[in-house]
Design a protein with these regions (language model features):
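Long C-terminal interaction/binding lobes of large macromolecular proteins
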Residues: 1-2, 6-204
Length: 204
């Protein structure tokens, strides 16, 4: 859309890449919208980059305006540091379809432990897993992710019907995984995803 070069992606991709001007585009309502993209650098020749939506959001109906609010609200066993009070609340959501249980587990783990990731604004040159979950569907999952991350369910579940989110920003972030043949292992977190689950997700 910007430079006239062909966009690249697989048949089920909802975000297409222009390798010429290093931009990414999501097709919405018959037109292409630019997507901000970052990556966390990986190491090793067997690195595959899996996409995640990093969504900055503020909650209504519950006190959820910063990462510190999230840690308190979900009762995480972490010390709330002063800098967390000024840190935007960012949900990390798989940008690929996968079984609901795995989807929620990945969202919970990566949202809680997002301090492990230090993205830089660039698109990986190769080994990109396709984006098969649109940003709009990732936004729709935020309530479920909040509920899934909450350790003391009775603190949050009764309020969920009245919860909504203001979306401030979103970025597509490619995280590095090591392909072991049977699993994909996230290089910073050591979280593993069974490759059969990824294959199944391509058929959802």
């Amino acid at each position: 859309p910007r430079c006239g070069w062909n966009l690249e992606g697989e048949r089920d991709s909802v975000v297409l890449i222009c390798s010429n001007c290093e931009t990414a585009w999501e097709a919405l309502e018959g037109k292409f919208n630019r997507v901000r993209v970052s990556k966390v650098s990986g190491t090793g020749g067997s690195t595959v980059y899996l996409p995640f939506w990093k969504i900055s959001a503020s909650g209504k109906g519950l006190p959820l305006h910063s990462f510190a609010d999230f840690i308190r609200l979900t009762n995480q066993p972490r010390v709330v540091r002063r800098e967390m009070e000024n840190q935007e609340m960012r949900f990390w959501v798989p940008a690929f379809k996968i079984r609901p249980k795995v989807f929620l587990n990945l969202s919970r783990q990566f949202t809680v432990s997002q301090h492990n990731f230090h993205p830089e604004e660039m698109i990986p040159k190769k080994n990109l897993y396709p984006v098969t979950l649109p940003q709009s569907e990732a936004v729709q999952s935020l309530k479920m992710i909040l509920a899934g991350a909450t350790l003391n369910k009775k603190d949050v579940l009764p309020h969920l019907p009245n919860v909504s989110f203001d979306i401030m920003d979103s970025t597509l972030v490619y995280l590095p995984f090591t392909d072991t043949g049977h699993e994909m292992i996230q290089q910073q977190m050591r979280t593993s995803i069974n490759k059969n689950s990824l294959e199944f997700g391509r058929r959802l």
